[in-house]
Amino acid sequence: LAREQVIYHDRVVPFNTLARDFVQKLTGKSSYKGLTPEQVIGGWLLYPEVWRNESLIYIKSAELQQLLGLKTPYARLTDLFDGSVYRLREHWQQGQSKLAKAIQETDEKVGLILMLEQGTFIQPLPADGSVKPLSKIQVKAELLYNSIPFSKILFMVNLAFGLLSFLLLLHNCLR
């Protein structure tokens, strides 16, 4: 499933790219409870009533967490609705306050979930051949890119250089 190709942000990508971005956007992590991103999306499509009750929508704002009555930074989709009424609608406000930004971020996450449930989030390649699929090597390259945690590697390299620089400075000062 990871290698299947879809259209995402107006380009052809492996399904893994779309799924990883979806899970990353919702949870702040590239996977959820040991499940691959593809398993999360597949599970949501097959069992939406179960996934609506999973606490996977990351809400960074403590103020919004309190407003929603959350005990953790993760909300369930059902936490954001009272029946069919969207709870954030009454608090929706355009503006630059931290709460307004947190509400907008959460609203974007809810929008992605609703698009997935309505079938508009995943766009397969057209059967008529009007869109050129990726080559096998391009798919492998994208999957490799998705699997490497670049920010973690960059942090570790910078930390190592910083430590080496400090030790070199310390060595020079003690001479």
PLM segments and residue spans:
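Soluble extramembrane regions of membrane proteins in the secretory/endomembrane system
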Residues: L1-I153
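Selective detector of the "anchor" transmembrane alpha-helix that sits immediately C-terminal
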Residues: F150-L174
